[in-house]
Amino acid sequence: MDREEPAESECTLRALVEEYNGACKEAPKEMSKQFTDYNTFKRYTTSKKDHAPQMRLVYSVRKPWPISMTPSKEIPLVFNGTKLKDTILDLGESKRTRANIVVPDYWSKYGSQTSLEVVNAILYAEDLKVQRFFSTEWGEIRYGRMLPFRKPVQACPTIEEVNPASIPHTLLQVFCPQYTTLDSKRKAHMGAVEKLKRVMEPICKVQTQESAVHIARSLIDSNKKWLPTVVDHTPRTAEMAHFLCSKYHYVHTNTQDLSDTRSIDNLCGELVKRSLKCRCPKETLVANLDKITIQGRPMREVLADHDGELPYLGICRVAMGLSTHHTMKIRSTKFSILNSDHPRIEVKKVFSLSPDVQVTIPYRRFKGKAKVYFQNDQIQGYFSCTDRQIDEIKISAPKNAPLLEPLLDICYYGSFIEPGFEQTFGFYPAGKREFVDSFFMHHSKDHKAFLIHMGLDKDLSLPLSPELNWKEPALSKVCRVTELDSTVQPYTSATREFVLGETLNVYTQHENGLELLICPTEIRSTRGPLPPGTNLSGSEFIDIYQDPFSRAKSLLKSTILHAERCKEFVGNMLEEYQDPAETTVQSLVPINTWGKSAKRKLQEEITSDPDWHQCPRKRAKMSYLAIIAGSIQDRDKKQTNVPRAFMLRGSQIEYDMKATRGLVVDTTNRIIVGGETVLREGKGGPEGYVQTGVFEEQPRCYLVDTPDHGLSMGLSRFCVHSQGRYFQYEKKISIWEETDNIKATIDSQRDLKRRRDIEEMVSKRARIV
């Protein structure tokens, strides 16, 4: 038997090798895939942890009092000889007690029954998950096998996703608004607050404060789950795969970390904002995207891996030739055009206070018929319109859901009601942003304009009440608003191409023109963290993530080393044109009164020497004046002369105009910026000379102005005075011919090698003896 076992093992191994080779031939594409290429997961446990959930359950149950509960007289201390709860009431800071594992069984048998409202509130999140599950359209059955590898999956929250920094303020606003400060109220997500109050009101009556807060947090906080990946297989292994993985379902997952996608959108936003200040925004954005890397990967590859409905990310994806989303977002409502006769046209309305005081506020409206899909959380549907008139609105929404906010978003999207577009709100508008805020504020307080636009009817079968609550009993109902009886998907029948305009507007191709999708000047966003590992050293927007010293150093290096860039920068600061470094300049210089004096000096220098930008020393001086000219001025104070030096804002670094100390130092042969030599004249000394010493007093040799001057005079030895010291140079003199020097070097190397060989041989013989 011992002799037969190796033969059997060999046969088994050969059979396995043949099976493996057969699988490789049948599906070469699948075999070449990496496990990170898959986005389908098998969920086999309800635990959020990834290690032995059943063992943790065992350890919890084995405790004498595994359950904590609020004190209740309905549960006795002892029942049929079994102790149900402990006598200790205070556990830490909460008034709770511990109970036996059988207490839930006792309560289900003898406890009081709660109301249906409380049950529905507690099961609200789980009901939504079940509804989503059964509304999913399943694809055809696929077989798979498990790999011992898990990937992080972002689980979307049930109610609404809230920024992690806003979650504590949102919860404070829900549970104890009387203790919140104005700053905390501003940071809270008010949309989530209203939804949470409706859901949590019945729960707070039966749950403890800690438990209710925990439930509320889980409804608005997105968490990561580590789920194992599933790898597709070939028919050869289908039987085994079906046996192993028959009881699983596929769940919709997001393999990208949403916080990572937001950080990339933050980076894209900084790039777009700075590119818009350049003379060629589109070319500038594309050129800089090609120079940026994130964790060693080019920006183009990173953008290809991240998709979504974030606006700045969409602009950069289109700039790189990639696709993006088809939706436009207004506040919390997403819109997607299903079909339309023409793209939305722009109308510029001019409001005049006097012949000399006018403001132009543009808005967009439909021309002809259009059908648009919209979605706001659980509220979705579509509306049909003709020009600025709504024909009908089909909506699917929960019962008694307030629809004021999404309906106002619809009215703003299509410019359907007034005032807000052709009419003012009783005062002269200062700008578009203020006009938009006034639109929502005005119509939120009084939605009479929407009711007049749609009309009222006594047909009580209609679902929308005059208070704009869904299926609320009322004496009259809103016309032309009906319930959506079939599912609508926001997909168009034809694939449309994306076009990036010169001002970084994103358009979609329409048979009759271009449809505006993303306008960067209308995006409202706040600064957020950049993706880790971002390298901006190759781009011209290196100031995005640096401190004042590094920003100033990068700016001055670019202007001192590049003549054309310095000429453009000085011209932009002098004429008050937009420049990529405008934000950097305003962040470096304190608010001052030196602007007019700096501009006057710049004009004098340019007039006296038109070729000033060819000299690096003049570029350094002009950069100093241009930075002051482009800084923020204090208009309430009298203008003063340019100072010789000033401190950079937020630091103790001095910037000197004459470049004798501080940030920029100019020696006779070097220009040093931030301790780094950026320009050196006569590097290495004149040709044919070598530096032989540095002295505090003048040595016995001829003193010249520059090393080139000494070279032109043909001196064998001379010195140059620089920075209080004397640098001595001597002419290189060789007493041998060049060929003799080479031959002597080779001979000396051979002699050295022979000597080492002899010494090694002698040492070996000495050891043997």
Swiss-Prot record:
Record keyword Acetylation present: no
GO biological process, one term: cap snatching
SUBUNIT field: RNA polymerase is composed of three subunits: PA, PB1 and PB2.
The entry's keywords: Cap snatching, Host nucleus, mRNA capping, mRNA processing, Virion
Signal sequence region: none
Subcellular location: Virion; Host nucleus
Pfam families, A to Z: Flu_PB2_4th, PB2_627-dom, PB2_cap-binding
Similarity section: Belongs to the influenza viruses PB2 family.
GO cellular component, one term: host cell nucleus
InterPro entries: PB2_627_dom, PB2_cap-bd, PB2_helical
Motif (Nuclear localization signal): 753-756
Location, primary (coarse class): virion
Full protein name: Polymerase basic protein 2
Function: subunit of the RNA-dependent RNA polymerase which is responsible for replication and transcription of virus RNA segments. The transcription of viral mRNAs occurs by a unique mechanism called cap-snatching. 5' methylated caps of cellular mRNAs are cleaved after 10-13 nucleotides by PA. In turn, these short capped RNAs are used as primers by PB1 for transcription of viral mRNAs. During virus replication, PB1 initiates RNA synthesis and copy vRNA into complementary RNA (cRNA) which in turn serves as a template for the production of more vRNAs.
